[in-house]
Amino acid sequence: MLQGRIAVLDVGKTLAKLTIWSADGRLEDRHVRPNARAVSDDGYPCLDVAGIDAWLAETLRAVTEKGQLSAIVPVGHGAAACIVDGDTLRLAPLDYEAELPAETRAAYLAQRDSFARTGSPALPAGLNLGAQLHWLEAIAPQKARSGVILTWPQFWAWRLCGVVAAEITSLGCHTDLWLPVEGCPSPMAVARGWAGRLAPLRRAADGLGPVTEEWQKRGGLRENCMVLCGLHDSNAALLAARGHAETRGRDCTVLSTGTWFVAMHSAAARTKLDLSSFPEARDCLVNVDVHGNPVPSARFMGGREAEMLEQAAAAPIDPKACEAALLDLARRMVERGVMALPAFQKGVGPFPESEGRWTDRPADQMARRAVAGLYLALMADTSLALIGSTDSLVIEGRFADDPVFTRALASLRPRQNIYLSHAHDSVPYGALRLIDPDLPPHAALLRTSPLPFDLSFYTAQWRSRTLTTDTIV
């Protein structure tokens, strides 16, 4: 059992969330803030550190009026780093969607280690953390070339307790800075001096220290409120999936669905990976779990593409509320051969160079949403095949409520046990398992069933029309 009330701070790209959990693992409260665009004092687009910081203090103050917290666990995405010195933030993290100048990017690409060493593909904009550090040194060399480099969850841990730490799930997610098989910094990180500026390596579950006096005053926290080191958000979802009986002790893949669809294949036992066997050009990568094990992964921007395909005139369709209509429309779209072909978000995913197009774009929004569900399933199936996903598959996140997507994926992968997590709190549940590994899940997994109509001919046609020379396994 957890000891006292716990807060999980999940700082994503789009939203910052603070959830409060009771000692028996029940959700007590949830607070959400949309993140704003920001510009740093040095003139580059950055993440909204100041806005999140102010919101966090105000929210913690409201939370602690109802009862004190015993611990805070920070979670964050894997494409942000801050440079700090003592108790000062020297440089805020770049916005990873900002495009590097062409010359700056070319100079960085020439220095990267191979994918076969790092498991990090060359990603666009600032999605490789090394590219951000390289660009920061060009923008503000005096500030960027000294100080401690902190990844995003560990920045918030430092902000709350004043202790710097590095952690492997954040260092090992497409950063270019880490070797997932060897478990050490990359040669480029060493050569550029970045490895020597990383904070001491700590485990995600380590308590770094109690909150500072500043946060005792601003957030109303007690002096014994402990701050954990924290972890990468997708790894928290993986840790959550491992808390279910259906996945324990067996191969398991978690498909987290939101703006990004991230598939992470966790083997039952550690095996030696040949990183060169994964196609770098198709957005495959190798993450690292909380135990230091390499985790083959693949991604595409499914949530973003679904929005582009649906093109909602007003409110987007709620797939859970419209299940029967969407399934019927999906059947009709399959019979007519109406398809969305990849990729509508160029530069990422299994078809990064292909130009997205409709074979016959429906005028009706509901029909477009049905085809979007089929498209997401075909894209997910492709990514899952690329990383060798087998046995149990857990779909979590908002698209676990999309019946066309989930049932189409079950049709495409009949040899896998496909489960849905409708908890909508997989990330905080995974974070809580750092404190109590035996904490039972607060919602059972649901087994999904295939579509009630045949998808094989439609699938074959979609695959034959995709604009790639790669083989779909």
Regions found by a protein language model. Give the residues of each.
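A short acidic/small-residue loop/turn micro-motif
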Residues: R33-R37, E97-E99, A199
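Nucleotide/phosphate-binding loop and acidic/charged catalytic motifs
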Residues: I72, A166-G172
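Short beta-strand to alpha-helix junction loop
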Residues: V181, A204-L208
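Active-site phosphate-binding/coordination module
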Residues: T64-G130
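Active-site core segments that coordinate phosphate-bearing ligands/cofactors
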Residues: V8, K17, L109-A122, A131-S146, ...
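Glycine-rich phosphate-binding loop of ATP-grasp-fold ATP-dependent ligases
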Residues: L91, S170-L177
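N-terminal glycine/serine-rich phosphate-binding loop of ATP-dependent small-molecule kinases
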Residues: M1-P93, R145, Q216-C229, D391, ...
